[in-house]
Regions:
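N-terminal pre-domain/capping segments
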Residues: 1-100, 115-116, 122, 126, ...
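Active-site-proximal loop/turn and secondary-structure-junction residues that shape catalytic pockets
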Residues: 12-14, 39-43, 68-71, 106-110, ...
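A short, acidic, flexible beta-alpha connecting loop/helix-capping segment that sits on the rim
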Residues: 12-15, 261-276
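Acidic/histidine-rich catalytic cores of soluble enzymes
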Residues: 21-22, 34-35, 65, 127-241, ...
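Short beta-strand segments at enzyme active-site cores
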Residues: 37, 64-65, 95-106, 138-143, ...
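Surface-exposed, active-site-proximal loop segments in enzymatic domains
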Residues: 68-85, 106-120, 150-158, 227-235, ...
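A short pocket-lining beta-strand/turn micro-motif at the edge of beta-sheets
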Residues: 211-213, 244, 256-262
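A short, acidic, amphipathic alpha-helical segment used as a generic capping/interface helix at domain edges
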Residues: 239-253
Protein backbone atom coordinates (compact mmCIF):
# COMPACT_ATOMS: atom_id res chain seq x y z
CA UNK A 1 0.00 0.00 0.00
CA UNK A 2 1.28 3.48 -0.87
CA UNK A 3 2.47 5.50 2.12
CA UNK A 4 3.38 9.13 2.73
CA UNK A 5 5.92 9.11 5.54
CA UNK A 6 7.45 12.13 7.28
CA UNK A 7 11.15 12.88 6.90
CA UNK A 8 13.15 15.28 9.06
CA UNK A 9 14.07 18.30 6.92
CA UNK A 10 17.05 20.60 7.36
CA UNK A 11 14.80 23.62 7.87
CA UNK A 12 13.53 22.02 11.10
CA UNK A 13 16.90 22.44 12.78
CA UNK A 14 15.87 25.96 13.79
CA UNK A 15 19.21 27.39 12.81
CA UNK A 16 20.93 24.90 15.09
CA UNK A 17 24.38 23.80 14.00
CA UNK A 18 23.76 20.06 14.23
CA UNK A 19 26.28 17.64 12.84
CA UNK A 20 25.17 14.97 10.40
CA UNK A 21 25.26 12.37 13.17
CA UNK A 22 23.25 14.58 15.53
CA UNK A 23 20.62 15.12 12.83
CA UNK A 24 20.24 11.39 12.21
CA UNK A 25 20.03 10.69 15.95
CA UNK A 26 17.42 13.45 16.34
CA UNK A 27 15.26 11.96 13.59
CA UNK A 28 15.32 8.53 15.21
CA UNK A 29 14.75 9.83 18.74
CA UNK A 30 11.74 11.97 17.80
CA UNK A 31 10.00 9.29 15.74
CA UNK A 32 10.77 10.22 12.14
CA UNK A 33 11.17 7.20 9.87
CA UNK A 34 13.47 9.18 7.55
CA UNK A 35 15.90 12.07 7.40
CA UNK A 36 16.93 14.38 4.55
CA UNK A 37 20.61 15.06 3.93
CA UNK A 38 23.10 15.74 1.17
CA UNK A 39 25.78 13.52 -0.29
CA UNK A 40 28.30 16.13 0.85
CA UNK A 41 27.20 15.61 4.47
CA UNK A 42 27.34 11.85 4.12
CA UNK A 43 30.76 11.87 2.47
CA UNK A 44 32.14 14.17 5.18
CA UNK A 45 30.92 11.76 7.86
CA UNK A 46 32.50 8.66 6.36
CA UNK A 47 32.21 5.94 3.75
CA UNK A 48 28.89 4.49 2.68
CA UNK A 49 29.11 1.58 5.13
CA UNK A 50 29.67 3.94 8.08
CA UNK A 51 26.75 6.15 7.05
CA UNK A 52 24.48 3.16 6.52
CA UNK A 53 25.41 1.82 9.97
CA UNK A 54 24.48 5.17 11.56
CA UNK A 55 21.11 5.23 9.79
CA UNK A 56 20.34 1.62 10.70
CA UNK A 57 21.38 2.12 14.33
CA UNK A 58 18.85 4.95 14.65
CA UNK A 59 16.04 3.21 12.77
CA UNK A 60 15.81 5.75 9.97
CA UNK A 61 16.22 5.66 6.20
CA UNK A 62 17.14 8.41 3.76
CA UNK A 63 14.24 10.63 2.73
CA UNK A 64 15.92 12.80 0.15
CA UNK A 65 19.65 12.77 -0.58
CA UNK A 66 20.72 15.95 -2.32
CA UNK A 67 23.61 16.50 -4.68
CA UNK A 68 23.19 14.02 -7.54
CA UNK A 69 22.60 16.48 -10.39
CA UNK A 70 24.93 19.39 -9.71
CA UNK A 71 23.76 21.81 -12.39
CA UNK A 72 20.56 23.62 -13.23
CA UNK A 73 18.44 23.32 -16.33
CA UNK A 74 19.84 26.59 -17.71
CA UNK A 75 23.43 26.20 -16.49
CA UNK A 76 26.18 26.80 -19.08
CA UNK A 77 26.50 23.82 -21.41
CA UNK A 78 29.95 22.77 -20.19
CA UNK A 79 28.80 22.86 -16.57
CA UNK A 80 25.62 20.94 -17.38
CA UNK A 81 27.41 18.27 -19.43
CA UNK A 82 30.06 17.78 -16.74
CA UNK A 83 27.38 17.42 -14.07
CA UNK A 84 25.64 14.69 -16.07
CA UNK A 85 28.92 12.78 -16.40
CA UNK A 86 28.99 12.39 -12.61
CA UNK A 87 25.35 11.36 -12.18
CA UNK A 88 25.88 7.58 -12.33
CA UNK A 89 28.59 7.56 -9.66
CA UNK A 90 26.70 9.92 -7.36
CA UNK A 91 23.44 8.03 -7.82
CA UNK A 92 25.27 4.80 -6.95
CA UNK A 93 26.19 6.37 -3.60
CA UNK A 94 22.54 7.30 -3.01
CA UNK A 95 21.45 3.72 -3.64
CA UNK A 96 24.26 2.35 -1.45
CA UNK A 97 22.92 4.51 1.38
CA UNK A 98 19.41 3.14 0.93
CA UNK A 99 18.00 6.12 -0.94
CA UNK A 100 16.19 6.49 -4.23
CA UNK A 101 15.38 10.19 -4.57
CA UNK A 102 17.23 13.45 -4.94
CA UNK A 103 16.06 17.01 -5.39
CA UNK A 104 16.54 19.98 -7.68
CA UNK A 105 14.74 22.99 -9.05
CA UNK A 106 13.08 24.25 -12.19
CA UNK A 107 13.53 27.93 -13.05
CA UNK A 108 10.75 30.38 -12.16
CA UNK A 109 12.26 32.89 -14.59
CA UNK A 110 14.43 32.49 -17.67
CA UNK A 111 16.86 34.81 -19.41
CA UNK A 112 14.80 34.64 -22.60
CA UNK A 113 11.09 34.52 -23.46
CA UNK A 114 9.31 31.32 -22.48
CA UNK A 115 8.79 30.27 -26.11
CA UNK A 116 12.56 30.30 -26.64
CA UNK A 117 13.50 28.81 -23.26
CA UNK A 118 11.02 25.93 -23.43
CA UNK A 119 12.73 23.79 -26.12
CA UNK A 120 16.10 24.31 -24.41
CA UNK A 121 14.65 23.08 -21.12
CA UNK A 122 13.01 20.09 -22.83
CA UNK A 123 16.33 19.07 -24.39
CA UNK A 124 18.17 19.47 -21.08
CA UNK A 125 15.55 17.51 -19.15
CA UNK A 126 15.67 14.68 -21.69
CA UNK A 127 19.42 14.45 -21.14
CA UNK A 128 18.98 14.56 -17.37
CA UNK A 129 16.36 11.83 -17.59
CA UNK A 130 18.68 9.68 -19.71
CA UNK A 131 21.59 10.23 -17.30
CA UNK A 132 19.47 8.88 -14.43
CA UNK A 133 18.26 5.88 -16.42
CA UNK A 134 19.17 2.61 -14.77
CA UNK A 135 20.53 4.23 -11.61
CA UNK A 136 17.54 3.55 -9.38
CA UNK A 137 17.38 7.24 -8.46
CA UNK A 138 14.74 9.81 -9.44
CA UNK A 139 15.02 13.57 -9.15
CA UNK A 140 12.19 15.82 -8.03
CA UNK A 141 12.33 19.31 -9.55
CA UNK A 142 10.58 21.98 -7.50
CA UNK A 143 8.62 24.68 -9.32
CA UNK A 144 8.37 28.03 -7.55
CA UNK A 145 4.76 29.16 -7.67
CA UNK A 146 4.60 31.43 -4.65
CA UNK A 147 4.03 35.00 -5.90
CA UNK A 148 6.14 37.08 -3.43
CA UNK A 149 9.85 36.67 -2.59
CA UNK A 150 12.55 38.38 -0.56
CA UNK A 151 14.28 41.30 -2.35
CA UNK A 152 17.60 39.45 -2.36
CA UNK A 153 15.96 36.51 -4.14
CA UNK A 154 14.59 38.81 -6.82
CA UNK A 155 18.01 40.46 -7.14
CA UNK A 156 19.63 37.05 -7.58
CA UNK A 157 17.32 36.31 -10.52
CA UNK A 158 17.56 39.71 -12.17
CA UNK A 159 21.36 39.84 -11.82
CA UNK A 160 21.47 36.80 -14.09
CA UNK A 161 19.06 38.35 -16.56
CA UNK A 162 16.26 35.99 -15.52
CA UNK A 163 13.28 38.27 -16.00
CA UNK A 164 10.98 36.25 -18.27
CA UNK A 165 8.35 34.10 -16.49
CA UNK A 166 9.01 30.42 -17.10
CA UNK A 167 7.61 27.48 -15.11
CA UNK A 168 5.58 28.66 -12.13
CA UNK A 169 2.89 26.01 -11.61
CA UNK A 170 2.14 22.31 -11.36
CA UNK A 171 0.28 22.45 -14.67
CA UNK A 172 3.34 23.82 -16.48
CA UNK A 173 5.61 21.28 -14.78
CA UNK A 174 3.34 18.45 -15.89
CA UNK A 175 3.27 19.88 -19.40
CA UNK A 176 7.03 19.87 -19.79
CA UNK A 177 7.43 16.41 -18.24
CA UNK A 178 4.85 15.08 -20.70
CA UNK A 179 6.87 16.55 -23.57
CA UNK A 180 10.07 15.06 -22.15
CA UNK A 181 8.31 11.68 -21.73
CA UNK A 182 10.04 11.58 -18.40
CA UNK A 183 10.86 8.37 -16.57
CA UNK A 184 13.29 9.58 -13.93
CA UNK A 185 12.69 13.33 -13.67
CA UNK A 186 9.71 14.20 -11.52
CA UNK A 187 8.29 16.86 -9.24
CA UNK A 188 9.03 18.16 -5.78
CA UNK A 189 5.51 19.25 -4.85
CA UNK A 190 5.49 21.97 -2.20
CA UNK A 191 2.07 22.86 -0.81
CA UNK A 192 3.04 26.55 -0.60
CA UNK A 193 4.09 26.81 -4.22
CA UNK A 194 1.09 24.72 -5.29
CA UNK A 195 -1.43 26.88 -3.44
CA UNK A 196 0.31 30.17 -4.26
CA UNK A 197 0.12 29.41 -7.98
CA UNK A 198 -3.65 28.77 -7.89
CA UNK A 199 -3.07 25.03 -7.92
CA UNK A 200 -6.10 22.75 -7.72
CA UNK A 201 -6.81 19.32 -6.31
CA UNK A 202 -7.87 18.27 -9.81
CA UNK A 203 -4.39 19.09 -11.13
CA UNK A 204 -2.86 16.81 -8.51
CA UNK A 205 -5.23 13.99 -9.43
CA UNK A 206 -4.19 14.40 -13.07
CA UNK A 207 -0.49 14.09 -12.18
CA UNK A 208 1.03 10.61 -12.60
CA UNK A 209 2.00 9.30 -9.18
CA UNK A 210 5.35 8.19 -10.59
CA UNK A 211 6.18 11.84 -11.28
CA UNK A 212 5.57 13.03 -7.72
CA UNK A 213 8.98 12.40 -6.24
CA UNK A 214 9.08 14.51 -3.07
CA UNK A 215 6.65 16.50 -0.92
CA UNK A 216 7.09 19.67 1.14
CA UNK A 217 4.26 20.64 3.46
CA UNK A 218 3.47 23.97 5.15
CA UNK A 219 0.58 26.41 5.42
CA UNK A 220 -0.30 30.01 4.63
CA UNK A 221 -1.87 32.71 6.76
CA UNK A 222 -5.65 32.79 6.45
CA UNK A 223 -5.75 36.59 6.21
CA UNK A 224 -3.34 36.70 3.25
CA UNK A 225 -4.76 36.31 -0.26
CA UNK A 226 -3.29 33.63 -2.50
CA UNK A 227 -1.67 36.18 -4.77
CA UNK A 228 -0.01 37.92 -1.79
CA UNK A 229 1.59 34.87 -0.17
CA UNK A 230 5.23 35.52 0.73
CA UNK A 231 7.66 32.65 0.33
CA UNK A 232 9.42 33.53 3.59
CA UNK A 233 6.29 33.90 5.74
CA UNK A 234 5.02 30.34 6.02
CA UNK A 235 3.29 28.84 9.04
CA UNK A 236 2.90 25.35 10.44
CA UNK A 237 0.56 22.90 8.68
CA UNK A 238 -2.94 23.21 10.09
CA UNK A 239 -2.52 26.82 11.25
CA UNK A 240 -3.73 28.38 8.01
CA UNK A 241 -6.27 27.81 5.27
CA UNK A 242 -4.55 25.42 2.84
CA UNK A 243 -6.70 22.31 2.17
CA UNK A 244 -3.88 20.06 3.31
CA UNK A 245 -5.96 16.98 4.10
CA UNK A 246 -7.45 17.08 0.60
CA UNK A 247 -3.96 17.77 -0.79
CA UNK A 248 -2.48 14.70 0.90
CA UNK A 249 -5.48 12.54 0.03
CA UNK A 250 -5.26 13.49 -3.65
CA UNK A 251 -1.52 12.77 -3.68
CA UNK A 252 -2.10 9.42 -2.01
CA UNK A 253 -4.65 8.47 -4.66
CA UNK A 254 -2.07 9.04 -7.42
CA UNK A 255 -0.16 6.08 -5.98
CA UNK A 256 2.68 8.21 -4.63
CA UNK A 257 4.76 6.25 -2.12
CA UNK A 258 7.44 8.38 -0.52
CA UNK A 259 8.25 11.10 1.96
CA UNK A 260 6.91 14.47 3.05
CA UNK A 261 9.13 17.10 4.65
CA UNK A 262 8.02 20.03 6.76
CA UNK A 263 9.39 23.26 5.23
CA UNK A 264 8.21 26.31 7.15
CA UNK A 265 10.40 29.15 5.93
CA UNK A 266 10.27 32.48 7.75
CA UNK A 267 9.89 33.75 11.32
CA UNK A 268 7.15 31.37 12.51
CA UNK A 269 9.56 28.74 13.90
CA UNK A 270 12.73 30.82 14.00
CA UNK A 271 14.78 30.09 17.10
CA UNK A 272 12.82 26.97 18.07
CA UNK A 273 15.20 24.28 19.31
CA UNK A 274 15.65 21.39 16.84
CA UNK A 275 14.13 18.76 19.16
CA UNK A 276 11.05 20.88 19.84
CA UNK A 277 10.74 21.72 16.14
CA UNK A 278 10.95 18.06 15.18
CA UNK A 279 8.28 17.10 17.71
CA UNK A 280 6.03 19.99 16.64
CA UNK A 281 6.29 18.82 13.05
CA UNK A 282 4.82 15.41 13.81
CA UNK A 283 2.22 16.89 16.17
CA UNK A 284 0.84 19.22 13.49
CA UNK A 285 0.70 16.45 10.89
CA UNK A 286 -1.32 13.98 12.98
CA UNK A 287 -4.76 15.68 12.68
CA UNK A 288 -4.19 16.42 8.98
CA UNK A 289 -3.29 12.80 8.31
CA UNK A 290 -6.30 11.61 10.29
CA UNK A 291 -8.62 13.85 8.28
CA UNK A 292 -7.04 12.55 5.06
CA UNK A 293 -7.51 8.95 6.19
CA UNK A 294 -3.76 8.33 6.22
CA UNK A 295 -1.30 6.97 8.76
CA UNK A 296 1.98 8.63 9.71
CA UNK A 297 3.73 5.27 10.02
Amino acid sequence: MARIRPTLHGSQLGGGNLSFEEKVVLAGRTGYPAVDFSLAEAHAYGDNAKVRHLLDANGVVPGTIGGVVRAGVFSPEEEFATALEHVHALAADVVALGGSTTGGGISRFAAMPKAEAWPIAVERLKRMDAALDGTGVRIGLEFLGCPVYKPETITHWTSRGETHPFIQSLAETNEILHEVKSRNVGITLDSYHWYGSDGTIAQIRETPGAWITLLHINDGKSDVARHDLHDFDRIMPGEGNFPLADWLSAISHTGFDGFVALEVLGPRMAGVAPEAYAAAGLDCLRPIYAKAGLSLT
